[in-house]
């Protein structure tokens, strides 16, 4: 089988090689940060946590799995799931935040934007309350009358499970 980069052009009777230039164009763009640096913006509707700050790494929970972002990461757009965002500063310190949902965009110029529906630092959360909310939601799920109610309760369960995991 021929590689997908080779296509037969109708009417020409010969093979033509197609070339992807995206990587070259992305590399030619001016970086948002210096070489080996990553510009990070992280905000919720009520608060800005980082605004174009240079960081070493960001770990994010997404619908397709958790992953770490470093400078020169492949461009991507992902939907966040409830979980822990860990920001590794250039000085070696880490900051941990719980996010409920949102999106993360990784650009070719090593800039990253994380927009969260809700986000709080871990020290603002109470493990006991998260466990109590989880137990309450699990018991409510057993008595849910319709599919819509079950779906809403399941979302609460997933969020509280992620909270408990982040705090333990």
Swiss-Prot record:
Gene3D superfamilies: ATP synthase delta/epsilon subunit, C-terminal domain, F0F1 ATP synthase delta/epsilon subunit, N-terminal
GO cellular component, one term: mitochondrion
Gene that produces this protein: ATP5F1D
Lineage: Eukaryota, Metazoa, Chordata, Craniata, Vertebrata
UniProt main location, coarse: mitochondrion
Modified residues (N6-acetyllysine): 136, 165
Name of the molecule in the record: ATP synthase F(1) complex subunit delta, mitochondrial
Described purpose of this protein according to its UniProt entry: Subunit delta, of the mitochondrial membrane ATP synthase complex (F(1)F(0) ATP synthase or Complex V) that produces ATP from ADP in the presence of a proton gradient across the membrane which is generated by electron transport complexes of the respiratory chain. ATP synthase complex consist of a soluble F(1) head domain - the catalytic core - and a membrane F(1) domain - the membrane proton channel. These two domains are linked by a central stalk rotating inside the F(1) region and a stationary peripheral stalk.
Single GO MF descriptor: proton transmembrane transporter activity
CDD domains: F1-ATPase_delta
């Amino acid at each position: 089988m021929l590689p997908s980069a080779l296509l037969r052009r109708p009417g020409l009777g010969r093979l033509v090689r197609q070339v992807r230039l995206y990587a070259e164009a992305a590399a030619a763009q001016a970086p948002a940060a210096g070489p080996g640096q990553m510009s990070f913006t992280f905000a919720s509707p009520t608060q800005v946590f980082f605004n174009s700050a240079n960081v070493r790494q960001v770990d994010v929970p997404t619908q397709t799995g958790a992953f770490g972002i470093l400078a020169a990461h492949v461009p991507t757009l992902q939907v966040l799931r409830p979980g822990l965002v860990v920001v590794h500063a250039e000085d070696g310190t880490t900051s941990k935040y719980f996010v409920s949902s949102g999106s993360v965009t990784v650009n070719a110029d090593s800039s990253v934007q994380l927009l969260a529906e809700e986000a709080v630092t871990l020290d603002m959360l109470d493990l006991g309350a998260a466990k109590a909310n989880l137990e309450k939601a699990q018991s409510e799920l057993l008595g849910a009358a319709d599919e819509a109610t079950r779906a809403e309760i399941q979302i609460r369960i997933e969020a509280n499970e992620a909270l408990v995991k982040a705090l333990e």
